[in-house]
């Protein structure tokens, strides 16, 4: 691959920095949300700045279907699959369909991922029968397919390397596969003892790129991105399907048993863990990182926030419904004269159909919207817009109020 072309791809679409030994920048670019959690490290952070209040830019309903995935966005196009097997490219400006693909006897429960290489303009997505497809971004033509033996529950992660972009994808057949982006050919496969339901995330370290999988086998797996060899496996509270969020030497995630953990992957040990609440409400939301805080949704109908350093609870905000969708952190400012200027805030949606923007430091409500239909997946932020898809088949798009 041409070195200049790869460098441009890195700058435009990924959170990677020039030197592989440096930590991953923890924010998606302001004009794109290229994968499920926005960044290679799974931080759920956007570099965008939104001005509140938001207002509906458009919404579009699709009959006899539901959405369970986070939209991904680049170059003014939204890519999103539904649970009844239609994968669509929609215009960010107005929701108009640019192309669509119908899978036979399959659905799309997880987010797609958009190629960071303009010379290989593909969007990658897995379905609930275990098939991973690569579509031409512009036309929807299928470029290649790769088959696994289990549902693809977590969105693929696209990792730029000196040898080309790699597709990392986990399957409920217990495997993590590394594929060549251009043709889908497998480069390595790593299997664990139980299902993989999360998206792989990546930390760039002095020892090389490390891939993290939080598995249904009750372990966090640390895997060498170049070879697929396991570097460590750390026992956790129990099974989990949530995607870890990585920063520095730590990854953060919750479990089905209701515990929340920070794992030091260099030491291969827990840095801290919170005990499950008395109700043992599971975490199916993936965490987002905001400065020194970790923000996550809970099945206990709340948004919870912990100090990244020691796990101390910072704040907890009750919600009307379960929060299985993952928060997105973005800087926001308000229109009031007393507004202190841009501050990090979390965009969160619940199963009762409520979308809120909460101050990341305090949990204070900054904005809210009642969509009616519930949400099982989180939002995407790009180009000044917030896009989220509901269980009732509606795609919503919000922008700064005129």
Predicted regions mapped to residue ranges:
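Bacterial N-terminal signal peptides
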Residues: 7-16
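Boundary at the C-terminal end of the N-terminal hydrophobic targeting segment
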Residues: 18-21, 27
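Extracytoplasmic beta-rich repeat domains
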Residues: 28-30, 37-40, 52, 59-72, ...
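Conserved beta-propeller blade signature
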Residues: 77-79, 88, 122-124, 166-168, ...
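Structural signature of WD-repeat beta-propellers
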Residues: 82, 127, 171-172, 215-216, ...
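Beta-propeller domains
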Residues: 82-93
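Short loop/turn segments that connect beta-strands within beta-propeller blades
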Residues: 91-94, 136-139, 180-183, 224-228, ...
């Amino acid at each position: 691959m041409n070195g200049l072309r790869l460098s441009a791809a890195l700058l435009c679409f990924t959170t990677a920095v020039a030197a592989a030994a440096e930590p991953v920048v923890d924010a998606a670019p302001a004009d794109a949300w290229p994968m499920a959690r926005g960044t290679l490290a799974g931080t759920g952070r956007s570099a965008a700045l939104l001005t509140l209040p938001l207002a509906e830019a458009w919404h579009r309903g699709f009959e006899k279907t539901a959405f369970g995935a986070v939209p991904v966005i680049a170059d003014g196009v939204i890519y999103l699959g539904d649970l009844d097997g239609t994968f669509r490219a929609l215009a960010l400006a107005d929701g108009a369909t640019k192309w669509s693909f119908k899978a036979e006897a399959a659905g799309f429960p997880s987010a797609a991922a958009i190629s960071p290489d303009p010379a290989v303009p593909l969007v990658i997505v897995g379905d609930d029968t275990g098939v991973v497809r690569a579509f031409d971004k512009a036309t929807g033509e299928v470029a290649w397919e790769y088959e696994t033996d289990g549902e693809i529950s977590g969105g693929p992660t696209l990792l730029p390397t000196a040898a080309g972009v790699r597709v990392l994808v986990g399957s409920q057949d217990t495997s993590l596969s590394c594929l060549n982006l251009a043709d889908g050919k497998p480069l390595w496969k790593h299997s664990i003892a139980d299902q993989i339901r999360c998206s792989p995330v990546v930390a760039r370290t002095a020892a090389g790129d490390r891939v993290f999988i939080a598995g249904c086998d009750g372990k966090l797996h640390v895997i060498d991105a170049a070879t697929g060899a396991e570097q460590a496996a750390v026992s956790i509270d129990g099974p989990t399907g949530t995607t870890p969020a990585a920063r520095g030497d730590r990854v953060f995630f919750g479990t089905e048993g209701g515990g929340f953990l920070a794992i030091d992957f260099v030491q291969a040990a827990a840095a801290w863990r919170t005990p499950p609440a008395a109700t043992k409400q599971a975490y199916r939301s993936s965490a987002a990182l905001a400065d020194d805080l970790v923000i996550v949704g809970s099945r206990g109908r709340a948004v919870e926030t912990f100090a990244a350093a020691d796990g101390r609870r910072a704040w907890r905000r009750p919600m009307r419904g379960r929060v299985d969708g993952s928060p997105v952190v973005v800087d926001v400012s308000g229109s009031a004269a007393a507004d202190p200027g841009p501050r990090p805030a979390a965009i969160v949606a619940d199963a009762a159909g409520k979308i809120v923007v909460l101050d990341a430091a305090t949990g204070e409500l900054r904005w809210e919207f009642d969509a009616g239909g519930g949400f099982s997946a989180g939002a995407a932020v790009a180009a000044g817009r917030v896009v989220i898809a509901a269980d009732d088949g509606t795609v919503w798009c919000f922008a700064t109020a005129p």
